[in-house]
Amino acid sequence: MAFAPMGPEASFFDALDRHRASLLAMVKRGAGETPAGATRVASSSEVLTAIENIIQDIIKSLARNEVPAFTIDNRSSWENIMFDDSVGLRMIPQCTTRKIRSDSPKSVKKFALILKVLSMIYKLIQSDTYATKRDIYYTDSQLFGNQAAVDSAIDDISCMLKVPRRSLHVLSTSKGLIAGNLRYMEEDGTRVQCTCSATATAVPTNIQGMQHLITDAKFLLIVEKDATFQRLLDDNFCSRMSPCIMVTGKGVPDLNTRLLVKKLWDTFHIPVFTLVDADPYGIEIMCIYKYGSMSMSFEAHNLTIPTIRWLGLLPSDIQRLNIPKDSLIPLTKHDQMKLDSILKRPYITYQPLWKKELEMMADSKMKAEIQALTLLSSDYLSRVYLPNKLRFGGWI
């Protein structure tokens, strides 16, 4: 069944079509390049062998009367991170490591957690079954203590084995939503047709299992906040701008939402834009989609989309549109610290227009939420701001 054309006339998308042509040319130039040290989807036998080797090392340590320990790349230091403009933030090949020792009061529990989770992952892969992070937590909630401890152990194991989480047969529940001109088949054969209606589709739990993706979308819009996403659907923005796809991670995106956006980019190579608040935390979220995060830098190749463009809300838009000053919010001390941190990151050097916008925010000492546009008119965002941005190439 073909998607029903409901959007604007073809000439509306001229700027988008030109942008896509430049993206396709760039993709063609960089085809086949994979960064050294990138995680890859490993076969079940490879992961099982890697786990067996780790356990053998522990047994050998015990046999030599040495203290068993896990050696894990340090994912919490900028010294271990490099910027690659084709991938984003990724770990350097020879990064510093940390030891999780079994005889240290500070790390003995962490050692036990990793050992326990390794055992569970081994059984999952052997039986070709999957479990969610939540399932793993509830198998021994007393040992784990909290969900965050499980999440951290899984990420450490993924980093230690140099494989993405999906190769470990561990899934996470999705909080993200998707709407628009897209249909696909899930791993179990379920056919899903996303729509432009007010009811969005939940991001699948197993992104790797998505098959037969079909779309005629001209662009993909990532919306920072669920409230803005729902407002756009209620205002029929998705229908009026059809064909398009909209995604929200409801704030800081979970892994599945990031994997989905990456899969859509890799499959269709359509322009991807972000709509975030003009504040340091909105910009941080946009940077996670575009360049990745320090903690997940070992898996950047599977998660980042450096071609993402910032559609709004730009600090310069606040001045250009004469948004009332009483709707602006002063930057807090934490905001200013976050802004300073972003300005010092390696990728900002490669984005002079972004840097200019961030400096404008720093100079004004003010921030604005997307909702501030409603002061101009209740549907200004969906009927004026976004359509004009898309039509006239108002992205950076």
From Swiss-Prot:
<dbReference type="GO" id="GO:0000781">
    <property type="term" value="C:chromosome, telomeric region"/>
</dbReference>
<dbReference type="GO" id="GO:0048477">
    <property type="term" value="P:oogenesis"/>
</dbReference>
<dbReference type="GO" id="GO:0003918">
    <property type="term" value="F:DNA topoisomerase type II (double strand cut, ATP-hydrolyzing) activity"/>
</dbReference>
<comment type="similarity">
    <text>Belongs to the TOP6A family.</text>
</comment>
<dbReference type="Pfam" id="PF04406">
    <property type="entry name" value="TP6A_N"/>
</dbReference>
<dbReference type="GO" id="GO:0007129">
    <property type="term" value="P:homologous chromosome pairing at meiosis"/>
</dbReference>
<dbReference type="InterPro" id="IPR036078">
    <property type="entry name" value="Spo11/TopoVI_A_sf"/>
</dbReference>
<dbReference type="InterPro" id="IPR002815">
    <property type="entry name" value="Spo11/TopoVI_A"/>
</dbReference>
<dbReference type="Pfam" id="PF21180">
    <property type="entry name" value="TOP6A-Spo11_Toprim"/>
</dbReference>
<feature type="active site" description="O-(5'-phospho-DNA)-tyrosine intermediate">
    <location>
        <position position="138"/>
    </location>
</feature>
<protein>
    <recommendedName>
        <fullName>Meiotic recombination protein SPO11</fullName>
        <ecNumber>5.6.2.2</ecNumber>
    </recommendedName>
</protein>
<dbReference type="InterPro" id="IPR013048">
    <property type="entry name" value="Meiotic_Spo11"/>
</dbReference>
<dbReference type="GO" id="GO:0007130">
    <property type="term" value="P:synaptonemal complex assembly"/>
</dbReference>
<dbReference type="GO" id="GO:0034502">
    <property type="term" value="P:protein localization to chromosome"/>
</dbReference>
<keyword id="KW-0460">Magnesium</keyword>
<dbReference type="InterPro" id="IPR004084">
    <property type="entry name" value="Meiosis_Spo11"/>
</dbReference>
<dbReference type="GO" id="GO:0045141">
    <property type="term" value="P:meiotic telomere clustering"/>
</dbReference>
<dbReference type="GO" id="GO:0005524">
    <property type="term" value="F:ATP binding"/>
</dbReference>
<dbReference type="GO" id="GO:1990918">
    <property type="term" value="P:double-strand break repair involved in meiotic recombination"/>
</dbReference>
<dbReference type="GO" id="GO:0005654">
    <property type="term" value="C:nucleoplasm"/>
</dbReference>
<dbReference type="Pfam" id="PF03533">
    <property type="entry name" value="SPO11_like"/>
</dbReference>
<feature type="domain" description="Topo IIA-type catalytic">
    <location>
        <begin position="42"/>
        <end position="177"/>
    </location>
</feature>
<dbReference type="InterPro" id="IPR036388">
    <property type="entry name" value="WH-like_DNA-bd_sf"/>
</dbReference>
<keyword id="KW-0238">DNA-binding</keyword>
<dbReference type="GO" id="GO:0007131">
    <property type="term" value="P:reciprocal meiotic recombination"/>
</dbReference>
<feature type="binding site">
    <location>
        <position position="224"/>
    </location>
    <ligand>
        <name>Mg(2+)</name>
    </ligand>
</feature>
<dbReference type="GO" id="GO:0007286">
    <property type="term" value="P:spermatid development"/>
</dbReference>
<dbReference type="InterPro" id="IPR013049">
    <property type="entry name" value="Spo11/TopoVI_A_N"/>
</dbReference>
<keyword id="KW-0479">Metal-binding</keyword>
<dbReference type="GO" id="GO:0042138">
    <property type="term" value="P:meiotic DNA double-strand break formation"/>
</dbReference>
<keyword id="KW-0539">Nucleus</keyword>
<keyword id="KW-0469">Meiosis</keyword>
<dbReference type="InterPro" id="IPR034136">
    <property type="entry name" value="TOPRIM_Topo6A/Spo11"/>
</dbReference>
<dbReference type="GO" id="GO:0001541">
    <property type="term" value="P:ovarian follicle development"/>
</dbReference>
<dbReference type="GO" id="GO:0007141">
    <property type="term" value="P:male meiosis I"/>
</dbReference>
<keyword id="KW-0799">Topoisomerase</keyword>
<feature type="binding site">
    <location>
        <position position="277"/>
    </location>
    <ligand>
        <name>Mg(2+)</name>
    </ligand>
</feature>
<dbReference type="GO" id="GO:0046872">
    <property type="term" value="F:metal ion binding"/>
</dbReference>
<dbReference type="GO" id="GO:0003677">
    <property type="term" value="F:DNA binding"/>
</dbReference>
<keyword id="KW-0413">Isomerase</keyword>
